[in-house]
Curated annotation (Swiss-Prot):
Principal location listed in the UniProt entry: membrane
Full protein name: ATP synthase subunit delta
Membrane protein topology class: Peripheral membrane protein
Subunit structure: F-type ATPases have 2 components, F(1) - the catalytic core - and F(0) - the membrane proton channel. F(1) has five subunits: alpha(3), beta(3), gamma(1), delta(1), epsilon(1). F(0) has three main subunits: a(1), b(2) and c(10-14). The alpha and beta chains form an alternating ring which encloses part of the gamma chain. F(1) is attached to F(0) by a central stalk formed by the gamma and epsilon chains, while a peripheral stalk is formed by the delta and b chains.
Protein's gene: atpH
Entry annotated with the keyword Nuclease: no
C-alpha cells in the first residue's frame, strides 16, 4: 500500500516537473532534500507524530531554505497528509520515473578486483549498444567470484564469473558420475 501511495506522490511531482521542463532539476533537488531530511537529528523531528503539522511545516521551511518553493511545498503536502515517513520511497519512485524518462538503466558490475576506467567504459559502451539505453554502472568488488564479471541488470543476472563456471563444471561432473 505504501508503495502505491509513494508512486502517486512521485507521479504527481513528476508531472509538474515535465510540464515545467525541469525534470532533472526537480530530481536533483528532491534527492538533496531527502538527504537533508534523513539526517538523524532532522529525521527524528520530521517523522515525529507528536509534533504538530504546522510546526513541522515551519521546520521544513527552515531546514530546506534555499530550495525551490515547489520542492518545499511538495514536502509540506506530504506532511499535511501524514506521509512524511514515505519521503524516501517517493524519491525512489521519482527516480524510477526519471530514469525511464531519460532512457537510463543501472547495471551492477561485480568483479573480484576494482576495474580500470577503460574496462568500465568498454562495458558501458557494449551495454548501451545492446540495450539502446544510457547505462549507469555501479562497480562492486566481490572477491568470492574469483575472476571474470557478473552483471546485474534489473532482475537479470549475466554471470561470467570464474566461480559460476567452476560450479557449472562441478555440476556436470556430478551428473556424469
Amino acid at each position: 500500500m505504501e508503495q502505491i501511495i509513494a508512486k502517486r506522490y512521485a507521479s504527481a511531482l513528476f508531472d509538474v516537473a515535465k510540464k515545467e521542463d525541469r525534470v532533472k532539476e526537480y530530481y536533483e533537488e528532491l534527492k538533496k532534500a531527502v538527504e537533508i531530511l534523513q539526517t538523524e537529528a532532522v529525521w527524528k523531528i520530521f517523522v515525529n507524530k507528536s509534533i504538530d503539522k504546522t510546526k513541522k511545516m515551519k521546520f521544513v521551511e527552515e531546514v530546506l531554505e534555499g530550495f525551490s518553493k515547489e520542492i518545499v511545498n511538495f514536502v509540506k503536502v506530504a506532511i499535511s497528509k501524514h506521509r512524511e515517513n514515505l519521503i524516501k520511497e517517493i524519491l525512489n519512485e521519482f527516480e524510477a520515473l526519471y530514469k525511464a524518462y531519460f532512457n537510463m538503466i543501472d547495471v551492477k558490475v561485480i568483479s573480484a578486483y576494482p576495474l580500470k576506467e577503460e574496462v568500465l567504459n568498454l562495458v558501458r559502451e557494449k551495454l548501451e549498444k545492446k540495450y539502446n539505453k544510457k547505462v549507469n554502472l555501479i562497480p562492486v568488488v566481490d572477491k568470492e567470484i574469483l575472476g571474470g564479471l557478473k552483471l546485474v541488470i534489473g532482475n537479470t543476472v549475466i554471470d561470467g564469473s570464474i566461480k559460476a563456471r567452476l560450479e557449472a563444471l562441478l555440476k556436470n561432473m556430478r551428473q556424469a558420475v
